[in-house]
Design a protein with these regions (language model features):
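Non-catalytic accessory regions flanking glycosidase/transglycosidase catalytic cores in CAZymes
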Residues: 1-125
Length: 125
């Protein structure tokens, strides 16, 4: 049997050491169709603060405060079954599908065009 001995380790952190500048695009986030993130979160046409696109202005203001510079969409487990073709075209013609990741019905009311509009509203390029 191998013998184990205790080893000593030392970690030195130099907060003045810089490898290089960090690009602004590193500080991002993602939007996933989980729970209330999209529907009744960022998109709720009947909400008192909703704009002409159905985006909640109170949420837009909070997202701006975060300072995110990029958003990955769709994000999380939702992307595993996402069909981008379902989220384009007239909303009333978009198919409803079972979201296999979260076992819910995806209406595709919020798709790629809506995401692009929402990003513009938040100032995230």
């Amino acid at each position: 049997m191998p013998q184990h001995s205790e080893a000593q380790a030392r970690l030195v952190v130099d907060d003045e050491f810089r490898v290089g500048p960090v690009h602004d695009r590193v500080f991002g986030s993602f939007v996933e169709h989980l729970g209330r993130c999209v529907y009744t979160g960022i998109y709720e046409p009947d909400h008192p603060t909703a704009d002409e696109h159905g985006f909640r202005k109170d949420v837009i203001d909070l997202v701006k405060e975060l300072g995110a510079t990029t958003i990955r969409y769709p994000g999380g487990n939702f992307v595993s079954g996402y069909r981008w073709e379902d989220g384009i075209g007239p909303k009333q013609e978009r198919p409803r599908r079972l979201d296999l990741a979260w076992h819910s019905t995806e209406t595709n009311e919020f798709g790629l065009p809506e995401m692009a509009e929402w990003l513009e509203a938040t100032g995230i390029n």
